[in-house]
Amino acid sequence: MQEKHIQNALMRGLHAALMTLTIGGFTTAANAQQASAPPPQNLPRILVLATGGTIASTSDPRSAIGYNAGGITGDQLLASVPGLDKIASIKAEQISNVGSQDMNGKIWYQLAIRIKQAIDRNEVDGIVITHGTDTMEETGFFLDHVLSTSKPVVLVGSMRPGGSTSADGPMNLYEAAEVAASPQSVNRGVLMVMNDTINSPRWATKTNTTSVQTFQNPNAGPLGYVDAASIRYLSPAPTSHRKALELPSGGLPRVDIVYAHADMDATQIQDAVQHDAKGIVLAGVGDGNASKAALDAMEAAARKGIVVVRSTRVSSGFVNRNVEVPDDKSGFVASYDLNPQKSRVLAQLLIANGVTSPDKVQKAFQSTY
């Protein structure tokens, strides 16, 4: 095992020397050499599902802005990373090629179905999903609630476009493949790997618009790290897991996020109701609070059977029940430590699974660990 990590460390060192990037795409000095050398036998089987994002972008190498997200295919991504064939038997499939601002429930469904299929057919030992960072935590959170597998599923992206100087995508993809291929990653649910760090989409959130260390865990911490010598998890894998929710084949219901602010009226809530939202998530001030006008409109929505969840626009901390807001009386659900975007995903899945009563929804929000 130690020899394998030493070999991987040496391969990491080759990246700087071998990797050359062009404005129109990726070229590597190592490609011809890799093609001629047969890969080692009995390697873990990794399926890369490509969805687009900055990691699959083209750009001017002199700039990290003005790039075209989703301009590179999954196969081109694999060809851009020397040494992948030494750690796993890897193939790529293209699920979509979009910036993650355009990620949607249809693509989530396609991802989940393909992952389930690959695992049920025993085609793979691990999955890597290349993805934009903007909504990566939402995709990961969704998949973590609908998949039931011990095999690693790892999301990876980049903050710098592929053609820029010192792009972070190739190393991130290499490390994601290492994590997906590692026996240590078994039974850990869906993971996110970027910038030498292993996170859970349950806890991680994007905190910076440009930094390569954008994913942080305000209410927890990372699951582990990847370095030149080893994959280092900070705790053992869980011995028990919550039951996966059914994957809704008919699409996800509409759940709107409304943003609280000073001088807030009821317009956002009323608009959500008028547009047939089945759920409303409040990105509230402080402990998930809002103006009296907004809270009154939310209570009226709850009386109509709409699922109403109080979250917060604050980056850390918990939204607790019945502190400033009378949740029991109003029929609201407290998100605890789930941010608005993850609260929305969970509410969508619960509603699609027929869970709509405030007490049952609240119980589900308390059981996401």
Go through each PLM region and give its residues.
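N-terminal secretory signal peptides that target proteins for export/translocation
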Residues: 1-11
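Bacterial N-terminal signal peptides
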Residues: 13-25
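ATP/NTP phosphate-donor binding region
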Residues: 33-117, 296, 355
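C-terminal non-catalytic interaction/assembly regions of soluble proteins
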Residues: 37, 287-369
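Accessory alpha-helical/coil subdomains and C-terminal extensions
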Residues: 43, 49, 73, 79-84, ...
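Short Gly/Thr/Asp-enriched flexible loops that form oxyanion-binding sites at enzyme active sites
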Residues: 129-151, 290-299
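Short, acidic/small-residue loops that bind anionic groups at enzyme active sites
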Residues: 140-171, 177-181, 303-312
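Internal gly/pro-rich beta-alpha loop/helix module
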Residues: 156-227
